[in-house]
């Protein structure tokens, strides 16, 4: 029996050394050391041995089992290393092959428009400032000379948190906050989100974007306002763009005007974009009302100023020929990729 055990060990070691995969090694383990394996079959004959022979044979059998198990572990480590090396070789990246192109995102047309507006007004010496979106009634209405019964104060137009706190309906409150903190000369623009209680449709949104401009200094005139807006229009819509003023009424400016620009699409000849009249409404503007200056501690006898406000969403739609404001807020890459 001792000879059988030694022969079994040599046979097992030879087979294990020739194994080329972990699967073959597992088969060898089961074949030699399993419950129905060759070692078990040999040990079943121990019943025929004398009492003196059994301990010796048992000791040899245990040693054979240990040697086979050690050979299996050693071979398993070697085979696993070779399998990993083979797998890595198969997965080797050819660095000479061109890489997969990564699709770059694009600026949203609103973001493009805001960047253009900032660049235009900064080039004219304006400073960009910001203000809170959650605003007080004073800064949104009272400080801007809006009458107590002005329709814009109604809950049908304005989102109220309480009787004194609202979501701002315009960027104009930044004018008051700036004039309270700064002494003339002042030359600022403010861009941001505004909110009105509108039902969404092709031209209205409860959330939209505005840019507000303010200049205050000694001797500021309507001519300065016109010159500033002409530079803006030519830079934003095109060098051939012209503007015209129409009398209007705003509580925070006097005199006030709505400003039209020649249609960027037809150059003033008349088309579907401008509804055939050659002009498109662009913004509201005027000279800062003396009451607004007084509210901010600025003497209107010494200083004057002009202000203007534009809907950035509308400007974007006009510039890029977008006919539905809702498209600006749907985050559809098929739409954004067009610009």
Curated annotation (Swiss-Prot):
E.C. no: 6.1.1.20
The subcellular location is: Cytoplasm
The molecular function terms in GO held by this entry are:
ATP binding; catalytic activity, acting on a protein; magnesium ion binding; phenylalanine-tRNA ligase activity; transferase activity; tRNA binding
Q: Which GO terms describe its biological process?
A: phenylalanyl-tRNA aminoacylation
Query: Per UniProt, which keywords does this protein have?
Result: Aminoacyl-tRNA synthetase, ATP-binding, Cytoplasm, Ligase, Magnesium, Metal-binding, Nucleotide-binding, Protein biosynthesis
Q: Which reaction does it catalyse?
A: tRNA(Phe) + L-phenylalanine + ATP = L-phenylalanyl-tRNA(Phe) + AMP + diphosphate + H(+)
Task: Report residues binding Mg(2+).
Answer: 254
Q: Supply the InterPro entries for this chain.
A: aa-tRNA-synth_II (IPR006195), aa-tRNA-synth_II/BPL/LPL (IPR045864), Phe-tRNA-synth_IIc_asu (IPR004529), Phe-tRNA_ligase_II_N (IPR004188), Phe_tRNA_ligase_alpha1_bac (IPR022911), Phenylalanyl-tRNA_Synthase (IPR002319), tRNA-bd_arm (IPR010978)
* Major localization class: cytoplasm
* GO CC terms, sorted: cytoplasm
* Note accompanying the cofactor annotation: Binds 2 magnesium ions per tetramer.
What does this protein need as cofactor? Mg(2+)
- Matching PANTHER family: PHENYLALANINE--TRNA LIGASE, MITOCHONDRIAL (PTHR11538:SF41), PHENYLALANYL-TRNA SYNTHETASE (PTHR11538)
Assembly with partners or alone: Tetramer of two alpha and two beta subunits.
Belongs to which family? Answer: Belongs to the class-II aminoacyl-tRNA synthetase family. Phe-tRNA synthetase alpha subunit type 1 subfamily.
Q: What is this protein called?
A: Phenylalanine--tRNA ligase alpha subunit
**What organism does the UniProt record list as the source?**
Alkaliphilus oremlandii (strain OhILAs)
């Amino acid at each position: 029996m001792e000879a059988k055990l030694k022969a079994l060990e040599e046979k097992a070691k030879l087979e294990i050394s020739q194994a080329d995969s972990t699967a073959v090694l597992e088969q060898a383990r089961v074949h030699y050391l399993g419950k129905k394996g060759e070692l078990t079959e040999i040990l079943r004959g121990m019943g025929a041995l004398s009492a003196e022979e059994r301990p010796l044979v048992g000791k040899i059998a245990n040693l054979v089992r240990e040697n086979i198990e050690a050979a299996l572990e050693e071979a398993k480590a070697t085979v696993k290393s070779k399998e990993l090396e083979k797998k890595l070789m198969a997965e080797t990246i050819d660095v000479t092959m061109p890489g997969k192109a990564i699709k770059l995102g694009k600026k949203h047309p609103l973001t493009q428009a805001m960047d253009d507006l900032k660049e235009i007004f900064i080039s004219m010496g304006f400073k960009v400032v910001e203000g809170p979106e959650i605003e007080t009634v004073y800064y949104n209405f009272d400080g801007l000379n809006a009458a107590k019964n002005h329709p814009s104060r109604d809950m049908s137009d304005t989102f109220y948190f309480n009787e004194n706190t609202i979501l701002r309906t315009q960027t104009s409150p930044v004018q008051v906050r700036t004039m309270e903190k700064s002494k003339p000369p002042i030359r600022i623009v403010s861009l941001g989100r505004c909110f009105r209680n509108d039902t969404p449709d092709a031209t209205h949104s409860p959330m939209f974007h505005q840019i507000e401009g303010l200049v205050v200094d000694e001797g500021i005139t309507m001519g300065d306002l016109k010159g500033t807006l002409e530079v803006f229009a030519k830079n934003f819509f095109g060098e051939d763009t012209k503007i015209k003023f129409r009398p209007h009424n705003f509580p925070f400016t006097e005199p006030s005007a709505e400003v039209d620009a020649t249609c960027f699409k037809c150059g003033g000849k008349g088309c579907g974009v401008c509804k055939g009249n050659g002009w498109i409404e662009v913004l509201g503007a005027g000279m800062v009302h003396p009451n607004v200056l007084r509210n901010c501690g600025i003497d209107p006898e010494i200083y004057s100023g002009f202000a203007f406000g534009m809907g950035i969403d509308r400007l974007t739609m006009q510039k890029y020929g977008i006919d539905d404001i809702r498209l600006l807020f749907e985050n559809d890459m098929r739409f954004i990729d067009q610009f």
